[in-house]
Amino acid sequence: MTLQFDDLRQRGDRCLNFAAYSPRRLVLIHTAVSLGASLVVGLLNLLFSQMIANTGGLGGLTTRSMLETAQAVLELAVTLALPFWNISLSRAALCWARGELAEPPTLLEGFRRFRSVLGVKLLTGFIFLGLCMAVSYIGSMLFLFTPFAGGLIEAMDPIMQNSGVLDPELLLSDEVMAQISSAAVPLMIFLAVLFAALAIPVWYRIRFADFAVMDGGRAAVSLLESFRITKKKAWEVFKIDLRFWWFYLLQLLTVVLCYGDTILAALGVQLPISPDVSYVLFYAAGIVAQGLLLWWYQARVSVTYALAYETLTADETVLNAQ
């Protein structure tokens, strides 16, 4: 069966309308925890940075170390916990798509399936890490045979000794490193394009691994299931993404808003307020904007993809039965 966006959206709206527990309320709880944790971490980082800056001298070395350790541990804890919290929304979306009850305890499903979710995340990371390493090595070799490699070869030539080993003295020269960095831009572009050309198709083949693991599958099985159901269907999933272009664009703009103070500073724009106040205002504004966006639209987007997963899974079941 072909994935028809309009049909998925209409079915999704019906699923949300008949949900026993308000999907927007559930998304609000999910978003409040996610963004609230990010906001708290951001504010605590600012506080810790100020405390570290105000602690000088050898006498404050122990205090600075403790503050830096607390800052690192806090960031690590939130970074590790959020993926398990965020993936739980996929379980809620599956419940909406199937007419099942999704309520606040559903948002803990990612933690209940800790091992499987962790396995999916690690395997996904290994897939793209391996792909990145392969592209870096093979792509660099291929780049040397292109006409764009001439500038980089010329920039590297002065620092190569007769034995083909880099001269460490010249490597310390700022002028030489600036020339190499400038000449390496075509290589970076080439590798980025090559990586995107390989990674995007792979990403769309494992796009539904989160739904599969929330549907009860184990880590490797969930990835294989996603590969199986998206066979010859990745383009249709991509077209669904294109129909949600406005949602992803608004998400990007909210992220840009969070770093508005940094962007304005890079553009040379100075605000008539202190940098710390500017950081807090922009970061809080971005968090609020993102929260409103997710509260209003996240349920409709999530249930659309959940219904796409259900459709693809049903199609594979029919094919296997035949």
Predicted regions and their residues:
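Short, membrane-exposed interhelical loops at transmembrane-helix boundaries
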Residues: L224, R228, G268-F282
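Interfacial aromatic "cap" segments that immediately flank transmembrane helices
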Residues: T2-A37, P104-A134, S181-A192, I200-L253, ...
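Low-complexity, intrinsically disordered extramembrane tails and loops of integral membrane proteins
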Residues: M1-R14, N162-E175, T313-Q322
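Selective recognition of hydrophobic, aromatic-rich stretches within alpha-helical transmembrane segments
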Residues: T2, R64-L101, C132-G151, Q179-A219, ...
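Short hydrophobic membrane-inserting alpha-helices and related fusion/pore-forming segments
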Residues: T254-C258
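Compositionally biased amphipathic helical and low-complexity segments enriched in hydrophobic
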Residues: G59, L108-E109, P272, N320
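Short, small/hydrophobic-residue-rich motifs at membrane-helix boundaries and re-entrant hairpins
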Residues: R9-Q10, Y21-R98, S116, G125-C132, ...
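Juxtamembrane "helix-exit" motif on the non-cytosolic side of transmembrane helices
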Residues: L47-I52, T262-G268
